[in-house]
C-alpha cells in the first residue's frame, strides 16, 4: 500500500440508517486496503464492530493522519473544534443537508477518497475563533468555534445594549437582538442568514453582523482577522449568552465582558483536487448558472 496516510479515523454521530451504512462501508473498505483504522466508540457500538479499534476524538487526533467525518456540517463543527488541536487532516462525507464542510458525495465518496489517499488533494487551513468571559483581569469560561460566536439572549428574544471595541479602540455601540461574529468558514452559515457578507475561506478577516439592529444605519463590518473584539455591557440584560457554533453556550454574568479573538488552532480541511469553492456556493445557495 502506497499512501500519504497510514492511520485513519472515522468520525460522526449518525442519525439515520444511511449514515450508519456509510460508516460501515467505509470501515470495511479502508481495512481491505490495509489502513490502520480507528473508529469513534459510539459508531463501533452502533454497528456492533467488536473487532474495531476504537477511540475518542482526542485519541483519533493524537494517533491518526486523517479523520473522515461522516454526517452534516454540525457533525463536522463538533469534531473540528477538537481535531483542530492536533496535527491531523480532516475531510467530510455529506450525510446531512447543506454540506458546506462535508463536501464529498456519499455515492462517489470512495472513488474520491482513493485519489485523496494517494495524495491528490488540496488543503485549506481554516482558523477558529476563541471566546472568553472575563471580569476585570480575571478570565474564566472559554470556548472555540469554527463558524461563529453569537451574542444573544438566553431565553426570550429582546433588545441588548452593548459596546464593541476593536483592539482596545471603541468601534460602535448597538441596540439589537444580538451580534454574530463569524469566521470566513462561518460566513455562509448563520451570518449569511442575517445579511452578512460571504468571505472566501482563506481571507484573513472576521465579520461582525448585527441581529435585528434598532437603527437603519447599522451594517455588517469586516475587520482584520488578527483583531481582538471586546463586548462591554453598561447595564447587563438578564439571561445573556455567548454561543459557539450553536453547540456550546457560555452564560454572561453582571460585570463580565467578552473577548473574541482568532484561536491559535487551525482546522486542516482537505478536498479532492477538483473541488471548486464557487461551484459549491452555486449549488448550495442556488445561484444562477453561467450564461455562456
Swiss-Prot record:
Q: Where found? A: Cytoplasm
Q: Which SUPFAM superfamilies match?
A: NAD kinase/diacylglycerol kinase-like
- EC numbers on record: 2.7.1.23
Q: What is its main location?
A: cytoplasm
Q: Which GO terms describe its biological process?
A: NAD metabolic process; NADP biosynthetic process
Cofactor(s) annotated in UniProt: a divalent metal cation
For whether the record's keyword set contains Chloroplast, the answer is: no
Give start-end ranges for the coiled-coil region(s): none
Which keywords does UniProt give here? ATP-binding, Cytoplasm, Kinase, NAD, NADP, Nucleotide-binding, Transferase
Q: Where is the active site?
A: 73 (proton acceptor)
- Name the Pfam families for this protein: NAD_kinase, NAD_kinase_C
Q: What class of enzyme is it?
A: transferase
Protein's UniProt keywords contain Disulfide bond: no
One MF term in the entry's GO annotations = NAD+ kinase activity
Q: Which GO terms describe its cellular component?
A: cytoplasm
Mind telling me which InterPro entries this protein's record contains?
ATP-NAD_kinase_N, ATP-NAD_kinase_PpnK-typ_C, NAD/diacylglycerol_kinase_sf, NADK
What's the catalysed reaction?
NAD(+) + ATP = ADP + NADP(+) + H(+)
Specify which residues bind NAD(+) according to the UniProt entry for this protein.
Answer: 73-74, 147-148, 158, 175, 177, 188-193, 247
Transmembrane feature ranges: none
Q: Which domain of life is it from?
A: Bacteria
In terms of NCBIfam families, this protein maps to: PRK01231.1 (NF002306), PRK03378.1 (NF002893)
List the HAMAP family hit by this protein, alphabetically.
Answer: NAD_kinase (MF_00361)
* Family, per entry: Belongs to the NAD kinase family.
State the PANTHER family in the record: NAD KINASE (PTHR20275:SF0)
Put simply, this protein is called NAD kinase
**Species whose genome carries this gene:** Sodalis glossinidius (strain morsitans)
Q: What is the lineage of its organism?
A: Bacteria, Pseudomonadati, Pseudomonadota, Gammaproteobacteria, Enterobacterales
